[in-house]
Amino acid sequence: MPTSPKSKVASKKREHRKAEFRSKLKVTPPILSSKKFYGHGIPEISLEQLTGKLIVLEGADGSGRSTQIRGLVDWLEGNGHATVQVGIKRSTLVSEELERAQEGNILSQTTMSLFYATDFADQLENIIIPSLKAGFIVIADRYIYTLMARDLVRGMNRQWVKNLYSMALIPDAVYYLNVSPQQLIQRNLAKTQSLDFWESGMDLGMTRDMFDSFVQYQHKMQQEFLRMQKAYKFKVIDGDRNLDAIYEELKTSINHVLAGNRE
């Protein structure tokens, strides 16, 4: 029996409604992360699920690093972003043991390096990765770069050190607050009236004078950071400037990162 014109119109309407219904059923694809490890990474981690941001501030004691982090956390959380902070010697697994070992100066350089790497790996696996998976902004008060620079300044093999930290995630942004050793001395003395044994490189035996040792050691660290900057592409910030100017520069850059760009 031939189809009537009315039936044809009704059929077309049904097909149109079906097509409209199917279009409504389309699921918006999830936002996938572009995270990568520097090397072998951690097995069985789905990088695509790490949708948060990892932001690192590097710099010596007295560089203003902690002050900037406090300001950035307040700013980020005030704008509705959940944040988590990590840093050197904050692992619940080994931080206390590492502190005691340093006080007694009882570890070889290789063992000390492995101790710090364990501290980092524990935080990476149990804090950084779960937080990124939950969509948090992770602020790292120093990362693998300080640990690598310390090892390299103390004569460790460059390739060995690079391999040791190849499990690290590549951050979304890294900022190195570059402050002159002379300025660092003034800031540390103003804050604590003393210089730290390890931050002065006294274990290297360069000189018995702690002030001279501090300047020499921090200069070596500075040179190592600038060398690493070429390989790891992080942003060097003039840390001798006014704290407010640095803060505004960091906020501008981090806003760029939050918009989906990599610094």
Map each language-model feature to its residues.
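ATP-dependent small-molecule kinase phosphotransfer cores
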Residues: 79-169
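A glycine- and Lys/Arg-enriched "phosphate-lid" helix/loop adjacent to the NTP-binding pocket
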Residues: 147-220
